[in-house]
Amino acid sequence: MPPRFLPASLPALMFAAVLPLHAQAATPSATPTTTTPAGPRADAVPLIERAKFFGNPNKAGGRISPDGRWLSWVAPRDGVLNLWVAPLNEPAAARALTNERGRPIRNSFWSPDSQTLLYVNDQGGDENFRLYGVDVASGTLKSYTPFDKTVVRVIGISPKVKDRVLVGLNNRDPRFHDVHSLDLASGKLTLVLQNDGYGSFNADRDLNLRLASRPNAAGGSDYFRISENKVEATPMMSVGLEDSQTTAPLGYTSDGKTLYWVDARGRDTAALLAQDVASGQTTVVAQDRRADITDGLFDPQTGRVQGYAVNYLKNEPVALDPALKPDLDFLKREISGEFTITSRTDADDKWLVAVDNVTVPPAVFLYDRKARRLSKLYDTRPELAGAPLVPMQAHEIKTRDGLTMVSYLTVPANFQNPAQPDIQGTPRQAVPMVLLVHGGPWARDGYGYNSTHQWLANRGYAVLSVNFRGSTGFGKSFTNAGDLQWGRKMHDDLLDAVQWAVQRGVAQKDKVAIMGGSYGGYATLAGLAFTPKEFACGVDIVGPSNLFTLLGTIPPYWEAFRKQLYRRVGDPGTPEGQALLKERSPLNFAANIERPLLIGQGANDPRVNVAESDQIVDAMKARNIPVTYIVFPDEGHGFARPVNNIAFNAVTENFLARCLGGRAEGMADTLKASTAQVRHGAEFAPGLKEALTVK
């Protein structure tokens, strides 16, 4: 299925540039420069070049065509991720289908007739995504949505309708996406429904629009039936704010008689429900008291649910269809680590399965159901084979008011404690630690291979990722506990996690850094401004500093979700909301910052405008408070161009080495390969001034 470019619920201020798929190689640095952290045999573990973590993957994003004839993936072509295709029975005969020179292609999906590979891309991180299609036989590339300042959304794609898809375009009104039928052969767009206020649409497998949703005055969502492309005036159901992040339709069966939902109404964790379309009656298919069910595994032909997964500490697949259970049991026996079924043929005889062993970068296998045979297709990062990667441990950490935060800890290889089982994750002595805060905040951290965890652990740090209140996946009560708690209880949760790590003997109390992107960047600024003595230093990546300007500059196509944002962050239209936003904005407390701060920002960020970083840097400069500020003119909400990601990480690890005493690889000409603009404070980041002089 194609990616969901905008969720039906509240859009997340997600930062994803740290994902391995988004990374691209720069020229490796020269001889590493290292600072030895306190502890036993700190240099006994080889230093892994950061380009091996964040450079281009060998291959990624594998897909199998619906007819089972082709394999596709993204892989480098002249240093940029492009689409490649190969016959299923001859993967070595791969050929590049695209020739992107600047912006990497991050993912793709097949047309239902298996003749076209579809993908989206933007310019310089502006998130004005256009839809492209490349003919597999001829290599002809089509730009299906060549409109300026327009974001495409894929609304419907079905194995029953081979020649077209449904897309949403906001070129008429930037706030709302009109629904069009796109003929894949000709590229013709035909208007299906003009949208005057709805946030999302759902189509059945005949590509008939069946459901529309929009936020209501209470901050929840109303759902409306659609008949003959007309939205009914009265909602068929309403979902309150408390359920809006955990309730959404998933899709219809092929006969159109059943609609599947994830639904938290009447329960805390979202269950998988089947709704009889004619009567409206619902039946609980599956539920788990620990965690939300967020999606299902559906039969490619009938659309009936066959399984689901529960992700609490780790991801646990569950079969519902007896015909599928032997396959999942086989995969569980044969695979060491977690696995995800990423692609299936229409005949459902072959699957692509991604495998994550944590201490090895993910690999992708072809699974032949009839033969019960699993064959490796590729490793995403073969250059890390044999590298000293380390385990990740899942923990449950209590907050001061009794909530449970699922969290993930990685400790350096040379500090692993052989006296403790790996699952405990206690190092032989306390080490410097990086608190890595996820974006969203309506998102979550999970178990698995994590390039940032591995990189920082290799430099000598423990790394802790925390699902603080407001994170999704752990029931609506936990998510809703974050409402109006930016910089308060959400921040208290992070402080509680640090205290847990210190008391457990994981972290040195005076050597804890805070780092993150988007909301994680906000948390970094909040950590240094609101609790200036708690952290040794901070790294903020595309984080908002002023909640007033953040809410005032959201993209126009988020208009339908504005009320939900106000209910969850703060309402700038009320005196109470204004007071809250003022006291939760780190900008207003910039004078309190006394620990080293590094800021990275994309100039074209449509979610967290560059002014968010400009403002706090200016405020710190006016008070002669040291800060290092790096802007990338060809990036948006995160650093998708891997030469830029590597460059910023080069500065980051040298910055952390001075702050925490870990190891660092030298910068050499890494910055030269990027578009980095050091707008302030090169003198405050070790090696940065020297790196800027490299010709």
Each language-model region and where it sits:
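Multi-bladed beta-propeller domains
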Residues: 29-59, 86-106, 111, 134-152, ...
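Non-catalytic accessory segments flanking enzyme active sites
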Residues: 60-63, 95, 106, 129, ...
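Bacterial N-terminal signal peptides
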Residues: 9-20
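Structural motif
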Residues: 80-84, 126-132, 174-180, 218-224, ...
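Active-site-proximal cap/loop segments of hydrolase catalytic domains
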Residues: 466-695
